[in-house]
Amino acid sequence: MGKFITTTLSPPLYARSKLLCFSLLYLFSTIFLFLYVSLSRNQCIFRYSPFDPIQAKLFSYPSSYGEHKYALPTHRSSCSSPIFFSDYWTVLKEIQSILSGSSPKENLRYINGKSESFGGNFSTQKRFSYFNHSNIDVEVPCGFFRDFPVSNSDRVEMEKCGLVVASAIFNDHDKIRQPVGLGVKTLETVCFYMFIDDKTLNSLFHHNVILKNNPSDYRVGAWRIIKISKSENLYLNPAMNGVIPKYLIHRLFPNSKFSIWVDAKIQLMIDPLLLIHSMLVVPEVDMAISKHPFFVNTMEEAMATARWKKWGDVDGLRIQMETYCEHGLKPWSSSKLPYPTDVPDTALILRRHGIRSNLFSCFMFNELEAFNPRDQLAFAFVRDHINPKVKMNMFEVEVFEQVVVEYRHNLKKIESSTYEEQEEEQKQESLRTIQKRRKWLDHESWSLNRSSCKNYLTDMWG
């Protein structure tokens, strides 16, 4: 008997080709979707090529310290103005060449002498009289009318630094956090300095971040710790003491050609050499600073400062704004371009030290001493009125959120260990209590009819 033989017919060639096309289309679509999702969070950051990051941890913190607690989320996943980083080794070579080159012959000359305050406490007219710096032989006020209490050994090391990343923690207000993404040669080229006071040092002792039997040359990972001794030469307000290294960094590090100021509430996530190169060297500017995420006009920031009780002396804020209005403060408009805004986020400041950026920093410090340490309020007035003009790269908020991580300030602080510190803390608390009892905002003070900022407010509100 014959057998039935069953055969399976293969699909025709055109059908197999269509199946292959669909498979490839699915594969490439999946890869594209994966890359898009992976990179969409980082669209502001583009690297030319890989570099060799440091693999080992810079510092191992005790678990009680909590250096990564309370990170603030970012709100922007896209970027209208991305930043491009060149090859690490090319950048390293170029920055080292700049650092080894000769310094400019023209330098600022500073007023020396002694005064009742660290900054000299100059009058309004006197401060503003220095804004037009057309004669390089004229000495300008720039702090240091009292000694800054650092040790001689620290001072010697600070004078050797050619590129510095600096920060400060006073009154145990923040945590020390290590920079991330450093190249293998960065620590040989860049100095990291953290200025702290006694209260912050006691907190570091308490958490065993620094051991008490260590020498006075303290280090925490990348950071060299500079203890600012308690002194009558400084200010009662810890925030004002933090302003000294923030705005007089060119005087504390006189041989530094570049600097990056990092508020202690943020953690640097990109190698500082790449930041300096992409934000200062390539665009050929004096400073780089982020735009404020919400405000464009100085008066908006002033009102928010009063509204959210960021500074308790509302009368002082009103006097400051009226002083600036009387001397020509204007709301932002296209006539101020290439400056895209009047309000920065000053948590991250990059500087190429020179006459223009140093003048701006000096005059900013003078205004902060005269009024308050809220540096966003004086920013536009100083920037718009000084001569020579400072060249600024005011980059997008999205970039800021990619190059740093922001954290909340310390929610719980270590108790002061000495009677003197406790007494000082009680004085500060009494001052804060008095400020809280006041009305946070006197609408009459900001009235269009009574304020010298009437024209400013009319132009701002339309």
Curated annotation (Swiss-Prot):
Reactions catalysed according to its record: an N-acylsphing-4-enine + H2O = sphing-4-enine + a fatty acid
Positions of transmembrane segments: 19-39
Protein name stated in the entry: Alkaline ceramidase TOD1
Membrane topology type: Single-pass membrane protein
Tissue-specificity statement: Preferentially expressed in pollen grains, pollen tubes and silique guard cells, but barely detectable in roots, stems and leaves.
Keywords from the UniProt entry: Abscisic acid signaling pathway, Glycoprotein, Golgi apparatus, Hydrolase, Lipid metabolism, Membrane, Transferase, Transmembrane, Transmembrane helix
Source organism of the structure: Arabidopsis thaliana
Alphabetical GO biological process terms: abscisic acid-activated signaling pathway; intracellular water homeostasis; lipid metabolic process; pollen tube growth; regulation of stomatal opening; response to abscisic acid; stomatal movement
Gene this protein is translated from: TOD1
Function recorded in the entry: Endoplasmic reticulum ceramidase that catalyzes the hydrolysis of ceramides into sphingosine and free fatty acids at alkaline pH (e.g. pH 9.5). Inactive on phytoceramide. Involved in the regulation of turgor pressure in guard cells and pollen tubes.
Residue ranges annotated as Lumenal topological domain: 40-462
